[in-house]
Amino acid sequence: MATLYDNEAKIKQAIVLLQKVVNDTSVPRNIRRAASDAIRNLQDPSLSPAVRAANATAILDEISQDPNMPSQTRISIWNVVSILETIRD
């Protein structure tokens, strides 16, 4: 069973990767907005780590199909989703 510390470390890692997407001006605005929303969900202290990860994954999964997304951004989003999918309560 994953410890809370492990989950929080994974969430912090995901936030760092998403922050890079948000700060990249070559990424379309709607994708940056979705990444910001995912970060906000990940930082919500009222929810358990698994729920925060699931909420963020839902946002990122939806936006990952955008045809306007640059390839390197899509790969970053997939990496974040992979990290978040390992979070369990």
From Swiss-Prot:
Extract the InterPro entries matched here.
Ta0600-like_sf, UPF0147
Q: Which SUPFAM superfamilies match?
A: Ta0600-like
An example of a Pfam family matching this protein is: UPF0147
Give the superkingdom in one word.
Archaea
What protein family does this chain belong to? Answer: Belongs to the UPF0147 family.
Q: What is this protein called?
A: UPF0147 protein Msed_2034
Lineage runs:
Archaea, Thermoproteota, Thermoprotei, Sulfolobales, Sulfolobaceae
